[in-house]
Design a protein with these regions (language model features):
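N-terminal beta-strand motif that seeds the catalytic metal site of vicinal oxygen chelate
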Residues: 1-20, 75-84, 133
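Vicinal oxygen chelate
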Residues: 1-2, 45-46, 82, 91-134
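Intrinsic, low-complexity N-terminal interaction/targeting segments
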Residues: 31, 37-39, 44, 55-68, ...
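Short, solvent-exposed interaction modules
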Residues: 70-96
């Protein structure tokens, strides 16, 4: 598998609204609209930064994986997303290497098809892989 580049960095927060205000006041950064990602039970906003984006993620319900993440680890860095040429090929290669994934089938993400590598394979860092829609 060959990584093309870093697509985005995910930051998990309690309040998108408050975080967007803070990032605007501190850094002059502006996000697009807040979107609801029902399949992941979160709300998100993307802030473009040249070649990559920041994805701000807010739990959409108290029973979501995102809420559990905040309770266990607090707000902050959630994941790093690497772009790959072919997500199905990347999944196949990782499975052959006995690397566990959160989903063995590509999921539909905001910018393309995605999967996540189980963090115990990557020094406890959550890594998202994405085949970007071209």
């Amino acid at each position: 598998m060959r990584v093309r580049n870093v697509n985005h960095i995910g930051i998990i927060v309690r309040s998108l609204k408050d975080t967007l205000i803070t990032f605007s006041e501190l850094f002059g950064l502006k996000a697009g609209k807040i979107i609801e990602l029902e399949q992941f039970n979160v709300k998100a906003a993307f802030i473009p930064l040249n070649e990559i984006s920041l994805e701000l993620i807010q739990p959409a319900s108290p029973n979501s994986d995102a809420e559990r993440f905040i309770k266990e680890r607090g707000e902050g860095l959630h994941h790093i997303c690497f772009e790959v040429e072919d997500i199905k090929e990347a999944i196949g290669e990782l499975k052959r290497k006995k690397i566990k994934l959160l989903s063995e089938k590509p999921l539909e993400g905001v910018g393309g098809m995605i999967t996540f590598i189980q963090p115990d394979h990557t020094n406890n860092a959550l890594i998202e892989l994405m085949e970007k829609i071209r």
